[in-house]
Amino acid sequence: MATTSSKVTVTTTAQTIASIDNVTQYVHLHSKGATYIGNSGVTTSTGFLLDNGDKLVITIPQGCELNAVASAGSHDLYVLTTRVD
């Protein structure tokens, strides 16, 4: 089991925050602004909203990825990922 942490600057351009992997990943998110998460085509219309200060733990199945986009400007998203080998 490997754990990594990062601070991602989320902008109005969607970006990958948990890459495709060959194992299940547990991803802990702490948003510091309005962040929308979802698949590779995530938008502010289709994503799941994390408001400023929200925290979420999500399981990403093998072969899937998680992406994020901001509603406006840019802000930080703290990410802690644990890979289950």
Regions found by a protein language model. Give the residues of each.
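Surface-exposed ligand/attachment interfaces on beta-rich extracellular proteins
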Residues: 1-23
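Short loop/turn segments at connectors of secondary-structure elements within structured domains
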Residues: 4, 73-76
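Noncatalytic modules at the cell exterior or secretory-pathway interfaces
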Residues: 24-27, 60-74
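Short, surface-exposed beta-strand/strand-loop-strand elements in extracellular ectodomains
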Residues: 30-48, 80
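Beta-sandwich interaction modules
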Residues: 51-63
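Edge beta-strands of extracellular beta-sandwich domains
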Residues: 76-83
